[in-house]
């Protein structure tokens, strides 16, 4: 399988159930416009809600469906948002942010934008950012395809991370998987030359699908294990993977570079 991408099998698995990045058909996509956010406020603790109200205006951005998806607005000014010029990594489906936080701390010179649809996961990450005084993470609540299409400029990202996207295991749902040729092509378009696409999955069938999709994208090539990379790919093992290790689940990782 090595010709499809750099793949590492290791024991472990899974992310919380509330962190899918698999996307339904366009007509079925779950958007969270600003008017809908209040309906889930009760899911946050008082401390989380207070931190959200205090820090979200500075560190967060909510993205709803475009009125005209064929006419995207201006892309994010990441230099202004972070207050500096630095390499930018987009993490799609950050869940509760365990990996996001650890990897951002590991590389303080890299700016990380974490995308997630679920407010509770973002609130957990926001509280950790506030507690640990982490300055190189920003958060987006919304649909990952909307973010890629409307907010990210071509050839602007040093890395994209997609860890444990929803595998949609039933055959009739495979079309809902996030990592399809069109999406991977869009990611490739947003990566700088030499930029990294780092994917991890614990689902064997999805791993085969991802390998095929990556091999079919001409702008990506497998990373050479001996070549230096512009960002770290040392992904921390979460408690969810540790718990599943006893079950014999294996994680497959892919690392591609933009040509």
UniProtKB/Swiss-Prot annotation:
Give the pathway listed in the UniProt entry for this protein.
tRNA modification; N(7)-methylguanine-tRNA biosynthesis
Q: Report the EC number(s), separated by commas if there are several.
A: 2.1.1.33
**Which residues does the record give as substrate binding sites?**
170, 202, 238-241
Query: Which cysteines are cross-linked by disulfides?
Result: none
Renumbered residue ranges of the record's region Disordered:
1-74
For this record, the Gene Ontology CC terms, alphabetical, are: tRNA methyltransferase complex
Q: What class of enzyme is it?
A: transferase
The record lists S-adenosyl-L-methionine as bound by 91, 116, 143, 166
One family from Pfam that matches here is Methyltransf_4
Q: Which PROSITE patterns match?
A: SAM_MT_TRMB (PS51625)
Give the protein's function.
Catalyzes the formation of N(7)-methylguanine at position 46 (m7G46) in tRNA.
Which family does the entry's similarity section mention? Belongs to the class I-like SAM-binding methyltransferase superfamily. TrmB family.
Q: Mind telling me what this protein is named? A: tRNA (guanine-N(7)-)-methyltransferase
What is the species listed in this Swiss-Prot or TrEMBL entry? Mycobacterium avium (strain 104)
């Amino acid at each position: 399988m090595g010709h499809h991408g750099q793949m590492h099998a290791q024991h472990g698995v899974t992310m919380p159930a509330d962190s899918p990045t698999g996307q339904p058909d366009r007509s079925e996509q779950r958007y969270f416009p600003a008017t809908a956010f209040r309906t889930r406020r009760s899911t946050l603790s008082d401390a989380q809600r207070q931190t959200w109200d205090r820090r979200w205006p500075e560190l967060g951005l909510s993205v709803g469906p475009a009125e005209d998806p064929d006419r995207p607005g201006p892309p994010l000014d990441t230099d202004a948002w972070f207050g500096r010029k630095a390499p930018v990594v987009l993490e799609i489906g950050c869940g509760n942010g365990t990996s996001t936080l650890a990897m951002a701390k590991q590389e303080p010179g890299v700016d990380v934008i974490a995308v997630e649809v679920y407010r509770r996961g973002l609130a957990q990450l926001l509280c950790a950012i506030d507690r640990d005084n982490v300055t190189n993470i920003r958060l987006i609540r919304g649909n990952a395809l909307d973010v890629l299409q409307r907010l990210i400029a071509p050839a602007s990202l040093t890395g994209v991370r997609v860890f444990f996207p929803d595998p949609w295991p039933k055959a009739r749902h495979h079309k809902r998987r996030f990592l399809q040729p069109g999406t991977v092509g869009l990611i490739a378009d947003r990566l700088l030359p030499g930029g990294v696409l780092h994917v991890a999955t614990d689902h064997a069938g999805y791993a085969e699908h991802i390998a095929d999709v990556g091999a079919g994208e001409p702008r990506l090539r497998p990373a050479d294990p001996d070549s230096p990379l512009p960002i770290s790919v040392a992904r921390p093992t979460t408690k969810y993977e540790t718990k599943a290790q006893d079950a014999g689940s294996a994680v497959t990782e892919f690392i591609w570079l933009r040509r």
